[in-house]
Design a protein with these regions (language model features):
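Hydrophobic, aromatic-enriched alpha-helical segments typical of multi-pass transmembrane helices
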Residues: 2-236
Length: 236
């Protein structure tokens, strides 16, 4: 195998994880927006437990949360792949590392949340089952952290222009903060429930920055490989 072939192979392997970031963010954004749009609601009457029961037995519970689970998985995979790219500054690398951990935990939490409907009657009856406890922790701790993580990633990525730019960061920041506050308080009050539609900005942010990263990767891949290949062929 010639030196130029080895260099080309190494560059191709190095670029594989980064190539999926844009498509996964865009797909995650679409499914997040769609899942939120069809999320079942409640009547607003009765206790928070009875309102939760209304949503759990709603016909759109599984379709909505299957889409949200797919979105969480896409986001987590995209962030993990982005973490593997080189050239990230210390601050951006730290943010990406922390958010990647949160994203994985949130994906697991959303999986449990998806199947909370299986325990709808027990929850309505006041039983403190494992699913109920897991759902409570997921809603009040994991989901808010995920929202804050997305907001932080949008800001850090926008300022460094590694994920989006200073304009797109506003979408992720507002959407992430809205999702975080609404999720953290949903078990206790309806006051911030109106913020959930605003959280759909996360989906819009992900689609926009995901599409922005598609041509960028193609340009950076070509620009980076050409000099290396020229040097390799010369030395060979």
């Amino acid at each position: 195998m010639s030196t130029s072939t080895r260099v080309r192979t190494q560059l191709s392997r190095a670029g594989r994880p980064e190539r999926v970031v844009g498509p996964l963010l865009a797909l995650g954004g679409v499914t997040f927006f769609a899942g939120g749009a069809i999320h079942p609601g409640d009547s607003g009457r009765g206790s928070k437990v009875s309102q939760l029961h209304e949503m759990l037995v709603g016909s759109m519970w599984y379709p909505s949360h299957a889409l949200l689970l797919a979105a969480m998985a896409c986001f987590a995979t995209a962030i993990l792949a982005f973490r593997r790219r080189g050239g990230l500054g210390t601050g951006m690398a730290t943010v990406t590392g922390a958010v990647s951990v949160i994203a994985v935990v949130a994906t697991i939490g959303m999986t449990l949340h998806l199947f909370a409907a299986l325990d709808a009657d027990g929850i309505a009856g006041g039983e403190k089952t494992f699913i109920y406890q897991a759902q409570t922790w997921n809603e009040t701790i994991v989901d808010p952290l995920w929202g804050l993580g997305i907001a932080a990633l949008a800001v850090a990525g926008g300022l460094t222009r590694t994920i989006g730019n200073p304009i797109t960061l506003a979408l992720g920041l507002v959407g992430g903060l809205a999702y975080s506050l609404a999720s953290a308080t949903i078990a206790f009050t309806d006051r911030f429930d109106a913020l959930f539609p605003l959280a759909s900005l996360i989906g819009i942010w992900a689609v926009v920055v995901g599409l922005m990263m598609l041509p960028r990767k193609a340009r950076s891949g070509g620009a980076a490989s050409a000099p290396d290949l020229d040097r390799a062929e010369t030395s060979n």
